[in-house]
Amino acid sequence: MKSTVEQLSPTRVRINVEVPFEELKPDFDKAYKALAQQIRLPGFRPGKAPAKLLEARVGRGAVLEQVVNDALPSRYSEAVTSASVKAIGQPEIEITKIEDGELLEFTAEVDVRPEITLPDYSELSVTVDPIEITDEAVEEQLLSLRQRFGTLTGVERAVEDGDFISIDLSATVDGEAVPEATASGLSHEVGSGQLIEGLDEAVVGVKAGESKEFTSTLVAGDHAGKEAVVTVTVGTVKERELPAEDDEFAQLASEFDTLDELKADLRERVGRVRKVEQAGQIRDKVLETLLETVEVPLPEAVVKAEVDAALHDAVHGLDHDEDALNKLLEEQGTSREEFDKDAKDSAERSVKTQLLLDAIADASDVTVGQDELTERILFQAQRYGMAPEQFIQQIQQAGQLGAVFADVRRGKALAGVVEQATVTDTSGASVDTAELFGNGEADTEEAASTDEVASDSAEGEDQK
């Protein structure tokens, strides 16, 4: 087999392939064997009919078509490997010549990873916010912890922000009931914004047993994107009473004996979260600097695939009705044109980021160990509330294990760049990136949010 590569653009090539028929003998043998199992000829046992008789029955053209279709994928892969083509996406294959008994010729056009000129990472510099641990931040965490240990008490008054209520919901569109928007006995914290839009504003001032109507746009189901008249009926109203800030509460809610010890622990935890937040800001700013300074040609087909995926996700909850999407966008004060532009901009940034970080990883010989891959899988399984075995099975079935591997590798590549960059905070102090990224990871997803700080302190009580 012979192959040549034409560079059509920085991100696309055409591979020209010539395959002599003698190299197709295994493919012909495979085709005849399959035909012999499918076709019964008098005087021959199943699978034993001679090739010439089989060919006479189905025609030479049918055999050739089967052989060529079976041969193309493997010959294409062989050509890509032999020419060290860094292909991405699916190829467009065209058969250009079939000389029976002599030669098969075909071309394959495919997007490829572009050549990227990388900068001197030590010349990169970014400025980030300093780490600040305020008394207010510690008090916020203490309040969050007190709320976790608060008690709910029924009250005989109108609903106020922060109350906990039980409600019944129903909705109509153009006077017609919407069954999927009907629910009874729902529990809701007023002000949380967890249920339908407009609910929190509607229930404030309503007493138990009373109803209130308001309008809201439905976001799912047969009536997605349509304005509905929603009726909410309040069943019960409860307020949360918080425990006092004292040593007794510290002993109840944590492993500590005094309130001062609990506050000191919360301060340390806030500090760790602030470090993680700063690491995330450093990572984002270094990446932004790279994206602004490094030229990365973008493969059009790959970008288009990302845009198509964004549209698919957007209409998935709307029964794949693009008209419903357009109406929903209009009601949200935007348009389909803006949506398409945002989707394209996002796709271009995503593809550019992946190509750039992959190029950095290749240039730095970044590897991913089994322990690192396992750690990421365990983290993501926990994040989605799934057992690790179930999560692994799901990503394997979806063919996403390679994507997880690539994400870990890209994170390590970016961390390597961050460690070489110059980072200062807005006060002029130098930031030690080795302390933040010394484990080779730029992944700050695993960090607890500030809302989880108090939760961690409370969990210490379970270990006393």
Curated annotation (Swiss-Prot):
Belongs to the FKBP-type PPIase family. Tig subfamily. Keywords: Cell cycle, Cell division, Chaperone, Cytoplasm, Isomerase, Rotamase. This is Trigger factor. The gene is tig. It comes from Rhodococcus opacus (strain B4). Residues 428-464 are annotated as: Disordered. The lineage of its organism: Bacteria, Bacillati, Actinomycetota, Actinomycetes, Mycobacteriales. PANTHER family: TRIGGER FACTOR CHAPERONE AND PEPTIDYL-PROLYL CIS/TRANS ISOMERASE, TRIGGER FACTOR-LIKE PROTEIN TIG, CHLOROPLASTIC. It is an enzyme of class 5 (isomerase). It catalyses: [protein]-peptidylproline (omega=180) = [protein]-peptidylproline (omega=0).
